[in-house]
């Protein structure tokens, strides 16, 4: 499992590994891929800032190229996941390559301008997708981000309709 993460999440990775071990007997490795500039490195295309002053860049292609260098052993099964913008990146990555058997997108930023349309216009290359939406995400006052609930339900419906093994919690 490759998880895109930032400094703010490093302290919880040990607990995450322990929780995964409780739930599976499958041997696994968690690779934490640290991201420094989230709005640039994880964004598939440029978009204006939706909070603060920092616009979104288009560094996802380069980030994915770096991640794929970790996935060269064809005898292994690879999964990718992340939270928020890293969840969006993980979903986007599933449309770029068939290297990842599954995607874990926790509260993904599917409100990102144009992303749901992108999902509908391209073919996903992963077999399984896990999506989650927290209790507070769609209750924000930010008009763009408050659409996350509608967007994630649309994306989930689209994936199910097209035969993808998908869970939404």
Tell me the role of every PLM-derived stretch:
Residues 6-10, 36-39, 87-88, 110-111, ...:
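Solvent-exposed loop/turn segments at secondary-structure junctions
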Residues 99-111:
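A conserved short beta-strand
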Residues 109-169:
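The feature captures the conserved acid-bearing segment of alpha/beta-hydrolase catalytic domains
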Residues 92-96:
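Active-site signature of alpha/beta-hydrolase-fold catalytic machinery across serine-
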């Amino acid at each position: 499992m490759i998880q895109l993460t930032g400094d703010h999440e490093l302290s919880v990775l040990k607990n995450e590994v322990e929780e995964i071990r409780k739930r599976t007997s499958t041997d696994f490795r968690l690779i934490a891929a640290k991201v420094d500039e989230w709005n640039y490195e994880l964004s598939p295309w440029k978009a204006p800032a939706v909070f603060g002053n920092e616009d979104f860049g288009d560094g996802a292609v380069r980030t994915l190229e770096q991640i794929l260098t970790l996935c060269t052993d064809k005898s292994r099964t690879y999964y990718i996941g992340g939270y928020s913008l890293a969840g969006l990146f993980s979903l986007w990555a599933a449309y770029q390559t068939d290297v990842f058997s599954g995607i874990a997108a926790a509260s993904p930023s599917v409100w990102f301008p144009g992303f749901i349309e992108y999902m509908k216009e391209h073919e996903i290359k992963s077999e399984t997708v896990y999506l989650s939406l927290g209790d507070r995400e769609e209750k924000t006052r930010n008009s763009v981000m408050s659409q996350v609930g509608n967007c994630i339900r649309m994306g989930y419906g689209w994936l199910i309709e097209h035969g993808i093994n998908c869970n939404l919690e």
